[in-house]
Amino acid sequence: MDLASLRAQQIELASSVIREDRLDNDPPDLIAGADVGFEQGGEVTRAAMVLLTYPALELVEYKVARIATTMPYIPGFLSFREYPALLAAWEQLSQKPDLVFVDGHGISHPRRLGVASHFGLMMDVPTIGVAKKRLCGKFEPLSAEPGALAPLMDKGEQLAWVWRSKARCNPLFIATGHRVSTDSALAWVQRCMQGYRLPEPTRWADAVASERPAFVRWQANHR
């Protein structure tokens, strides 16, 4: 694995990421959520993609793609591992969203190219990174109150907002993916909350990917 070449690709791609608002349809009619996981000991990459109406946030379509994993797990290079399955799920959608929430990092990445930025750039679609763990940068400790907020900083640059979406839950790291500003990324996530730790797009993507009870109930009601 030529990591030097991949690192150079990341730096080059990151320079093309658009960090300002460029939504073609604002407000959006459809928002997607995307989640990637692995099966069979990492041999299979699974990507789930859901479509929700906005502002009702009702699930109207979902697709799950499974493909052979083409790259080993290497921290800092996960987008190269996850992107092919995301693309496969994206291509199955009968209609394309105006905005995509990706479970993962956007520009809050050492080389400013997490999976949300990589996917958004390749598809030229507005994306937001909604990550559960910090990958780089520093932030001031948050209070325990829901709504507590702090900028994630690295080398004098704000990479994300660190936001406690729910009491007694770890915060989310919300960042520009592509064609969405940092502040707008936070605002869109806040508009898509319904009382859970995760915003509805990535919560539903996780539910579909893992066949959680909420998705099983949804299937039963939509047969």
UniProtKB/Swiss-Prot annotation:
GO biological process, one term: DNA repair
Membership in a protein family: Belongs to the endonuclease V family.
Enzyme class label: hydrolase
HAMAP family found in the cross-reference section: Endonuclease_5
Catalytic activity: Endonucleolytic cleavage at apurinic or apyrimidinic sites to products with a 5'-phosphate
Subcellular location: Cytoplasm
Obligatory cofactor(s): Mg(2+)
Role, per record: DNA repair enzyme involved in the repair of deaminated bases. Selectively cleaves double-stranded DNA at the second phosphodiester bond 3' to a deoxyinosine leaving behind the intact lesion on the nicked DNA.
Domain of life: Bacteria
Record EC number: 3.1.21.7
Repressor found in the keyword field: no
NCBIfam families for the chain: PRK11617.1 (NF008629)
One GO cellular component term noted in the UniProt record for this chain: cytoplasm
Name this protein carries in UniProt: Endonuclease V
Site keyed Interaction with target DNA: positions: 73
Gene designation per UniProt: nfi
InterPro entries: Endonuclease-V (IPR007581)
Keywords noted in UniProt: Cytoplasm, DNA damage, DNA repair, Endonuclease, Hydrolase, Magnesium, Metal-binding, Nuclease
Positions annotated to bind Mg(2+): 35, 103
Predominant cellular place of this UniProt entry's protein: cytoplasm
Any one GO molecular-function label of the UniProt entry: deoxyribonuclease V activity
